[in-house]
Amino acid sequence: RNDYKDLIEMYEKNKKANKDQPQFFFNVTMQNHGGFSNNKVRFDEPVKITNFKAVQALDNYVSLMRTSDTALKDLIGYFKKVDEPVIILFYGDHQPSFSDDATKQLNEHSLYKSDNDKRLSKFVVPYFIWANYDIPEYDGMHDGGLTGEYNTVSVNYLASILLKYSGVELSDYDKYLLNLHQYIPAMSALGYWDGNGKRLFSTHITKPQASEFGAATRHKQKKVDEKKAEKLKRGYENVQYNLIFDAKDKLWDIFLPRKEDNK
């Protein structure tokens, strides 16, 4: 909550000093990163798990989630009332790590049976984009499954999606990523999703090992061009190398908006 208060204060200070300048904040909070075993923590609105006997760490974590939800509601409530366009992207990078006792209890109630799926579930997190003006709406938390163009996505695509919804001019790199997302919606060290929303744990696209993790999705089945997907994946590896390591021959015109767009 204090983190969001600081963010609002910075926003108001910058707006007062530079009225016509847009603002961008990349705000990282460690609110719910752990540990969770402290039994002396006192919450204004504590939450207690009742459908199974939980250790203190799990009760503390869900109480922290409630506290964070309240703070987020207040943050959005503030920006609903400002007199200029505001867009917020909210996401996390992984599920929390618990003590061995808490992890054992969670595994007993897990929806995922295989070790691969349990590992993967630690990196499946919700995200949302909110704006105080009209943008295309899709509520993946309520609609469920992997339905929706941007409900299956990895972090490498989020910046381009945010820029798209912001209505700003996209760089060639952003357009490239949005196109790549159609064929490989999400990717990680554990594998990737294919175009039908099915999780594949192999990193070799032409001979994937399918997982049941995505079996319950409501994607309409479509023919996946595996050769094209493989070509796109290898091309993306080259683009990443140029962006991160190739200082001498970096293709700045690809990664930045065109000069004429900035006039």
Question: Can you say where each PLM-predicted feature lies in the sequence?
Answer:
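Solvent-exposed soluble domains appended to multi-pass membrane proteins
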Residues: 1-263
